[in-house]
Amino acid sequence: MSVLESIIDGVREDLAVRESTIPFDEIKQRSAAAPPPRDVMAALHAPGVGVIAEVKRRSPSKGELADIAEPAELAADYAAAGARVISVLTEQRRFGGSLADFDAVRAKVSAPLLRKDFIVSPYQVHEARAHGADMVLLIVAALEQVALEALLDRVESLGMTALVEVHTAEEADRALEAGAKVIGINARNLHTLEVDRDVFGRIAPGLPVEVLKVAESGVRGPSDLMAYAGSGADAVLVGEGLVTSDNPRTAVTQLVTAGSHPACPRPSR
């Protein structure tokens, strides 16, 4: 069993518990009653290379990354430093995240929020919207094509934006076939957890100009953002590099500054 398969098994078990507590019909009603989602596309289309800053306690590859006692305060620092979107992990077993973290961040910041989890069910999409999500992660490697297309349609029908994550050219083709408007290219192989920063440069040039391209994993500082920008990145998603830094707010500021610097390659959108 791969790491991804193991994570998804746990996600399904935890999902079953939540569904037994709050039935699907009720979570759908809550999602319909939630305030309208924020415009993620407008945020990511702003000039320069954007930063999606992540609240991340743990990872399967590194274990404990940071003791984040106040996720809302961390998110507020990210937003104040210029992050365009805040990503919040809600997977609990491997990443130490929770919907409680998400709720705390939502109550604190006005920036668009990405629910970062392993979405395998329409229930989770409505759950994300009910908790105030504006963007939802869909991982191509975790989904059959029919499920990917159905979940993407569900996300967009609720007014949210899908970040469709790929790691190979074949997965990118599947994402495009499903109608993805924002594609995240993850340098990390979710089956083996190995990181290859060259993956972005191999896949991004083959994507249509109108598709927003997000570089995921492997961003340790401004030079990595610049490198990804040179390969066509419209934005970078950064978690570990921020939460393990001495000053996460300063780290975001440095990335945002790099993304708007005249020397930074311009996104070709």
UniProtKB/Swiss-Prot annotation:
It comes from the Bacteria. PROSITE patterns: IGPS (PS00614). Keywords: Amino-acid biosynthesis, Aromatic amino acid biosynthesis, Decarboxylase, Lyase, Tryptophan biosynthesis. Its EC number is 4.1.1.48. Pfam families: IGPS. One of its GO terms (biological process) is L-tryptophan biosynthetic process. InterPro entries: Aldolase_TIM (IPR013785), Indole-3-glycerol_P_synth (IPR045186), Indole-3-glycerol_P_synth_dom (IPR013798), Indole-3-GlycerolPSynthase_CS (IPR001468), RibuloseP-bd_barrel (IPR011060). Pathway: Amino-acid biosynthesis; L-tryptophan biosynthesis; L-tryptophan from chorismate: step 4/5. It catalyses: 1-(2-carboxyphenylamino)-1-deoxy-D-ribulose 5-phosphate + H(+) = (1S,2R)-1-C-(indol-3-yl)glycerol 3-phosphate + CO2 + H2O. This is Indole-3-glycerol phosphate synthase. The lineage of its organism: Bacteria, Bacillati, Actinomycetota, Actinomycetes, Pseudonocardiales.
